[in-house]
């Protein structure tokens, strides 16, 4: 049955422990289906409400674009970056070198080019990265989950490593 009211979809971005702050920091991407009843009116009201709350908005072309943006360009991408940190940490452990010292080699490259972000090699837990993988039914994306579980088995205290970097994550 078709709804007689417009439905707006807006993915949430931010870290749970500072969600109120992050909701205002990030642009609120949203979408309303092109064939939604009273879509232009709903869109206008939504933008006005968000602006009143101090939240910037950006309308996307269709719901699939926004959902894929959330899963592919945000949470799965973060998963791959953390996987690489996990792999590089396992290599550092294997060769008995300090992970942070090893990564300091890339600090200036990141500073000048912005394309060598250092991630922290913790276990991927939480409510976003791993659960969002299940929405895609992709063997390739599921490698993130497999690598994460392998890391937890191979590295002592893998699930507690984040504590070392907690202050840098704020």
Residue ranges, per PLM feature:
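Interdomain hinge/lid region at the active-site interface
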Residues: 64-68, 78-79, 83-169
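Internal alpha-helical scaffold of NAD(P)-dependent oxidoreductase catalytic cores
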Residues: 2-14, 19-114
